[in-house]
Amino acid sequence: MSAGRITAKKLALAGMLTAVAAALSVLERFLPLQAVVPLPGVKLGLANVVTMFALFFLDFRLSAAIVLARCLLGALLGGGPTGLMFSLTGSMLALLVMAALKRGHGRAFSLFGISVAGAAAHNLGQVLVAMALLNDAAVLAYLPALLAAGLITGVLTAAAALPFFGKFSKTGVAGK
């Protein structure tokens, strides 16, 4: 079996993870987070639990496909084209950063460090989209507040993911 081959098990897992990520994205829209954190655009990043999970138990290609499908489904289910630009840019940048840091997992970066860096990358991606849409660099002034929120949400996301990592790695479902 070649290393790049996608098995039926992995494809089925990717499909399930896509459904879970899309459901979490939609669910997150209904959480009244703005009542607790009065910063526009701040979300918990629940779907990033799935992204990290896919990175660790599948591969980069399938993880990217899951992120792309989640963003497209989110746009179709109410996010619209502007929401797609924000979501896709932030999510893909987060995926790239987390994939790069995953190589140092256990040595240089913990799951928490990878998650926080992913949250920061996601926020940076969204600010870059806002700058492009508004044609105004003043949007960068919002980045420190988003990065502070990303620190908190990144830690929460990693804490939510951690119990699943240990249990799932013992099943052998992903072939690792």
Question: Model features per residue range: what roles?
Answer:
Residues L44-F60, V97-K102:
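Generic transmembrane alpha-helix motif of multi-pass integral membrane proteins
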Residues I6-L17, L44, N48, S63, ...:
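Residue-level signature of transmembrane alpha-helical entry/exit and packing/kink sites
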Residues A14-M16, A23, I66, S87-A121:
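Short helix-perturbing small/polar motifs within transmembrane alpha-helices
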Residues S25-L44, A69-M98, L111, L134-A138, ...:
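Interfacial aromatic-anchored transmembrane helix boundaries in multi-pass membrane proteins
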Residues A21-V26, M52, A75, S91, ...:
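Transmembrane alpha-helical segments of multi-pass membrane transport proteins and ion-pumping complexes
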Residues L58-L68:
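Transmembrane-helix signature of polytopic, membrane-embedded enzymes
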Residues S2-F53:
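Hydrophobic transmembrane alpha-helices
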Residues P38-P40, G80, L84-M85, G104-K176:
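Membrane-embedded alpha-helical hairpins and interfacial helices in multi-pass inner-membrane proteins
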